[in-house]
Structures are given as structure tokens and as C-alpha cells.
Swiss-Prot record:
InterPro entries: aa-tRNA-synt_IIb, aa-tRNA-synth_II, aa-tRNA-synth_II/BPL/LPL, Anticodon-bd, Anticodon-bd_dom_sf, Beta-grasp_dom_sf, TGS, TGS-like. It is found in: Cytoplasm. This is Threonine--tRNA ligase. Gene3D superfamilies: 3.10.20.30, 3.30.54.20, Anticodon-binding domain, Bira Bifunctional Protein, Domain 2, Threonyl-trna Synthetase, Chain A, domain 2. GO terms for molecular function: ATP binding; metal ion binding; threonine-tRNA ligase activity; tRNA binding. The gene is thrS. GO terms for biological process: threonyl-tRNA aminoacylation.
Length: 635
């Protein structure tokens, strides 16, 4: 007999060689019917797994969040099965679960069409309703390679041949379809009920542009119809808010082929950019940061010394000149260390908080570029804190508070923290890592955050915090980071004189709040759906005259607003007032100042705020005061 421990703390005895499914059935038939996979000693397994030793067991159903990835992986296999039934000449390659769904890559001569997706999805529904049994099989490597070659699946044969010797070769069979997979999977295809195929895109085999182009079908799958419908509704709303679409409509920026991944900022977009930079500059000055500016083009010797040349060379833009290799900086940290090293630093100089709106360049693949969200030229609200080990907690607490203030000012209050601890391969002793991790954990708790752990996901040079925002339609964006670094000060020979007189290495905290300004502006455009708050809007007040004989007064009002730092636009054309109001509303300008004869007579304006038909009559001085008060809160 074996002892099986359950999540409620109970321990029950069962005969050896019992399957997880049989245990579930012994507990209740309803549990066995709903069961998808088993968690045995913390590891997810198929329900068919044979249990022959004492263990901790948890039976998972579709209600458990861990099963969402299983459902999506199952949906990927279901997609491949449907494609093979409909288009048998197609070769299958790989199909993992990803955030919000899955994809499967196929090799075929004829591209899939939108009509094909509808047919494939219908076939998937049919296969789901068949509720085909899914079984796991262990195969001999050579036999598996020969089998897939014999049925024309050469990509699968190549994958199997590349699996290290000694690793098991597991295949999963459902109906007439068989696929290479580690698993686990649910026991039948019927668990995949709520799904939709989204689009087809190109993808290179093994992600290498030198290889052949495959066709990638993207899909989404959920545990319930309500979840699927909610997700599709969110996508519909996201499409309306797409920053690329709004960027064109609101005349904020554009991209073009001659400068891929580089933003052409228009005056209104550049206004938003500069306002955010001004806001951040005020915040960091209040929090004891100095601001610096470092070169964009730096000799490769510095990147070699820092380790970036070895690690990021393929992502860097480099050029040869005067027998030297220069590189556009992909990040600011090595340059900040050079400033720290100018002159002798004492423990009294620490913590030293050094910030920069640093222009960086990264050679992103053209296929990865995505509007403002993924660019090749970017400016980071970057800072590095040089401190002693005993100052880590206080500095992290201060940073968390600053970050919270900033996010709140932009309207983000739902902030999640991810904590990435030591990886297997790392620099520094366990004692150093213990102290570093404990310092960050203590700081996060002091700042009032809870965190989720990403085990082993820290950099080799130190643990990391990531700050994730949730936007108005429920999407999550990782923006802020705080990365501890024991290694770069050592590599670049940064030191300070301790109170004892000995030379010590500072700890370096890499931190950013917004990430890149480009990406954060993209997030804000979608968060606000283009309706920027008054202090941030590129045009704060638009002036519209009812008749042309009021134009002189309108120009007086505009001059008064501009003289007081209010960003304005005006329309004194002979167009009808309703047209002018509609046009300014479409441009999502927060305040429209309507001028009629009464307003001219009383030296006033009638203010209509975006999204309302109500009007509020103000003197020009009152209007200026309203805008100034809002600006001064943030700027």
C-alpha cells in the first residue's frame, strides 16, 4: 500500500500502481469526470500516470488556473489534428500555449486563407464533440524518427533527432493524429470547447530567418464560454484603442519604411512626449536624483569590458571608423559607471542616484517591431542607484513609493509585483544572494506590495523586481523594473571608500518606472483611448467662434492662453459651430471654448468639456486658472 497526501491535509492509503484517475474516481465520480490533470509532488502529470510511491496529490479541473495552459496546449493539438484531416499534405511542426492562447506552425505550399480558418475551426468543433481519447505513448527514438519520416513529417523527425540522448520520447495520440509532446494533456479532446482561431502569420522554422518560412495559426482557448466572450470583447475594444490607429487619427506620430522602428513624432505627439519627460524630471529631482547625459556612440572596448558585447552583440548597431568599432548604446548602465568613477567616491556620497533620459538603440528583428510598443530607437527613463549593501532596502522602498506615485498620476492603481530570485548559474556567493533577496523582499513588503515569485528568473548578476500595470480593459503591461547588480561595478572597477578606509564595490540598482517613453506613450494612448487628461493633452483648449466677426476676440483669447502656458488650437473659419465642435471632439481635445457675441461682450468663454454637452461660462482669467491649477499638480 502507498500513502497519498491531499491538499486538505488528509492522507489515504491505496494499492500500489494505481493511476491518478483511479484515485480521483475513488474520491468521487464527479471529480473523476471533471479531472484534467494531476499534480504529483508539485509536478503536473497526465491522469493516466501510475503512482507507485507515497506522494502528495492534487487533482486539477478546469476551475484551477493551472489548467488554462493545458486547455490551450490541447487546443493546439486539436488545431493540428483538424488541419491534417482537411489538408493532409501539410506538415506539422510545433504548437505551444502562449499568453491568452496558443499557436501552431505548419509547412505547406499554399497559404491558409481566412476561409480556411473558418473550415478548420468547424472541424475542431467536430473533433471536440467526438471527445476522442488522448493517450500518452513512450517510443524508441530511432523508431519515432523513422515513423515520422515515413508519413512525411520531416520537421517532427528533425526535432526528435535533436532531443538529447537519454531523454524519453513521448508521443500523444488522439483519433488518427499523433504528435510529439512532453505533455501533460487532458484525457480527451472534449475538454477543448471554447476556442476561436484568430489569424495566420508567417514564422521561420526554429525562429531563424535563414530557414524556410512556415505558416503560424494563432488561436485562443478558455475554460468557459463567458471567458472566451469576455476576451473577444476585450480584443474588439483593444482594436478601437490601437495606438497605431489613434496615432494616425490624432496626428501624433507615424512610421515609414525608410526608418523602420524609428518614430516620426508630430508636434502633438512630441508635446505629449515632452510633457511626460517634464513630469518625470520634476519627480526625480524631488527624490534626490541627479540628471546626466552620456554619449550615444561608444567604443566597443567599453561594451567588451561590461560584458554587453558578448551577450548583446547581435542586438547592437555597430560601425567601423578610424580602425575602431563603435556601437550605438543599447543601454545606459556602463556609461553611468564611467561618471561614477570620476573622482574618489566616499561612503558619504552614497546613495548616489543618477538618472538619464537615455537614447538607446536595439537591432530588433523587423518582424518584431510593433508601433510604439517595440522600436529600434528608444528613450528610457533610466536611473542607476549606487549604494552600500545596507542601503538596498531603504532605496528600494523609496523607489517603490516613487513608482506608485507616478503610476497613480497616470491613472494606474492596480500594480502587481513579480520577484525573480537566483538562477542556477549566477555570480556571487549564496550568502550575498541571501542578503540581496531578503533586502528586496523586506522592501517590497514595507512599501505595501505583495509579490509573486518567479523562481530562478533573476539575472546572473542579481535578483529583480518587475512592476506590472493593469489597464482600463484588463490587459497587463510590465513597465517598471528594479534590478540589483553585483557584477557590473566589479567588471568596470567602480569603488568607494568605506568608513573603515577600505575600498569597496558599490551595489548597483538599475531601475526604470516607465520603461521606454515610446512604449509608455503607446500604453497611455490605449489606456485613455486618445482622451488624454487635461495636463497631458497636446491641445488643452480649442477655441471655436460662432461667427467670423468674433475672430479678433478669439485671437485675443488665444494669445492670453498661450502667454500663460496653455496649449491651444483654434478654428475661426466660416464653418458652422456644430461642425467645429464635432471636429475638436473627434480630436479628443479636453476643453472647447465656444465664443459668441455674449461671450465677447462679457470677456468670457463658454467651456464645453469632452464627452458632455453641458457648457460652463468662465472668464478668460478663470479658464487660465483652471488649466494652470491642473498643470501645476503634475508639472
Amino acid at each position: 500500500m502507498i500513502n497519498i497526501s491531499f491538499p486538505d491535509g488528509s492522507i489515504k492509503q491505496f494499492a500500489k500502481n494505481i493511476t491518478a484517475y483511479e484515485v480521483a474516481n475513488a474520491i468521487s465520480m464527479s471529480l473523476a469526470k471533471a479531472a484534467m490533470v494531476a499534480e504529483i509532488n508539485g509536478e503536473l502529470q497526465d491522469l493516466s500516470i501510475v503512482i507507485d510511491n507515497d506522494c502528495k496529490l492534487r487533482i486539477l479541473t478546469a476551475k484551477d488556473p493551472e489548467c488554462l495552459e493545458i486547455i490551450r496546449h490541447d487546443a493546439a493539438h486539436l488545431t493540428a489534428e483538424a488541419v491534417k484531416e482537411l489538408f493532409p499534405e501539410t506538415q506539422v511542426t510545433i504548437g505551444p500555449a502562449i499568453e491568452n492562447g496558443y499557436y501552431y506552425d505548419f509547412a505547406r505550399d499554399t497559404p491558409f486563407t481566412t476561409d480556411d480558418l473558418a473550415v478548420i475551426e468547424a472541424k475542431m468543433q467536430e473533433l471536440s464533440q467526438k471527445n476522442e481519447q488522448v493517450t500518452r505513448e513512450l517510443w524508441d527514438r530511432d523508431k519515432a524518427v523513422e515513423f515520422f519520416k515515413s508519413i512525411g513529417e520531416h520537421y517532427k523527425a528533425e526535432i526528435i533527432a535533436s532531443i538529447p540522448a537519454g531523454e524519453p520520447i513521448t508521443l500523444y495520440r488522439q483519433g488518427n493524429f499523433i504528435d510529439l509532446c512532453r505533455g501533460p494533456h487532458a484525457p480527451s479532446t472534449g475538454v477543448v470547447k471554447h476556442f476561436k482561431l484568430m489569424k495566420v502569420a508567417g514564422a521561420y522554422w526554429r525562429g531563424d530567418s535563414r530557414n524556410e518560412m512556415l505558416q503560424r495559426i494563432y488561436g485562443t482557448a478558455w475554460a468557459t464560454k463567458e471567458q472566451l466572450d469576455s476576451y473577444l470583447l476585450m480584443l474588439e475594444e483593444a482594436e478601437k484603442r490601437d495606438h497605431r490607429k489613434l496615432g494616425r487619427e490624432l496626428d501624433l506620430f507615424h512610421f515609414q519604411e525608410e526608418a523602420q522602428g524609428m518614430v516620426f513624432w508630430h508636434d502633438k505627439g512630441w508635446s505629449i512626449y515632452n510633457t511626460i519627460e517634464q513630469y518625470i524630471r520634476k519627480k526625480i529631482r524631488k527624490n534626490g536624483y541627479t540628471e546626466v547625459k552620456t554619449p550615444v556612440l561608444v567604443d566597443k572596448s567599453l561594451w567588451e569590458a561590461s560584458g554587453h558585447w558578448e551577450k548583446f552583440r547581435d542586438d547592437m548597431f555597430a560601425l567601423e571608423t578610424d580602425d575602431k568599432t563603435l556601437a550605438l548604446k543599447p543601454m545606459n548602465c556602463p556609461c553611468h559607471v564611467q561618471i561614477f568613477k570620476q573622482g574618489i567616491k566616499s561612503y558619504r556620497d552614497l546613495p548616489l542616484r543618477m538618472s538619464e533620459f537615455g537614447l538607446c538603440h536595439r537591432n530588433e528583428a523587423s518582424g518584431a517591431l510593433h508601433g510604439l510598443m517595440r522600436v529600434r530607437s528608444l528613450v528610457q527613463d533610466d536611473a542607476h542607484i549606487f549604494c552600500a549593501a545596507e542601503q538596498i532596502t531603504d532605496e528600494t522602498v523609496s523607489f517603490c513609493k516613487l513608482l506608485t506615485e507616478v503610476y497613480k498620476d497616470f491613472g494606474f492603481t492596480d500594480i502587481k509585483v513579480k520577484f525573480s530570485d537566483r538562477p542556477e548559474i549566477r555570480a556571487g556567493s549564496n550568502e550575498v544572494w541571501d542578503k540581496a533577496e531578503n533586502a528586496l523582499k523586506e522592501a517590497v513588503e514595507q512599501a505595501g506590495f505583495t509579490y509573486t515569485l518567479n523562481p530562478g528568473e533573476g539575472a546572473f548578476y542579481g535578483p529583480k523586481l518587475e512592476f506590472v500595470l493593469t489597464d482600463a480593459i484588463g490587459r497587463q503591461w510590465q513597465c517598471g523594473t528594479l534590478q540589483m547588480d553585483f557584477v557590473l561595478p566589479e567588471r568596470l572597477d567602480a569603488s568607494y571608500v568605506a568608513a573603515s578606509g577600505e575600498k569597496k564595490r558599490p551595489v548597483m540598482l538599475h531601475r526604470a518606472i516607465l520603461g521606454s517613453l515610446e512604449r509608455f506613450i503607446g500604453i497611455l494612448i490605449e489606456e485613455y483611448a486618445g482622451r488624454f487628461p487635461l495636463w497631458l493633452a497636446p491641445v488643452q483648449v480649442a477655441i471655436a467662434t460662432i461667427t467670423s466677426d468674433l475672430n479678433d476676440y478669439a485671437l485675443e483669447v488665444q494669445k492670453a492662453l498661450i502667454d500663460n502656458g496653455v496649449r491651444t488650437d483654434f478654428n475661426i473659419s466660416p464653418d458652422k459651430i456644430n461642425y467645429k465642435i464635432r471636429e475638436f471632439s473627434n480630436q479628443k481635445i479636453p476643453m472647447i471654448a465656444v465664443i459668441g457675441k455674449q461671450e465677447q461682450k462679457n470677456k468670457q468663454v463658454a467651456i464645453r468639456r469632452l464627452g458632455t454637452t453641458d457648457q460652463e461660462v468662465l472668464s478668460v482669467e478663470q479658464l487660465i486658472a483652471v488649466v494652470k491649477e491642473e498643470n501645476e499638480k503634475y508639472l
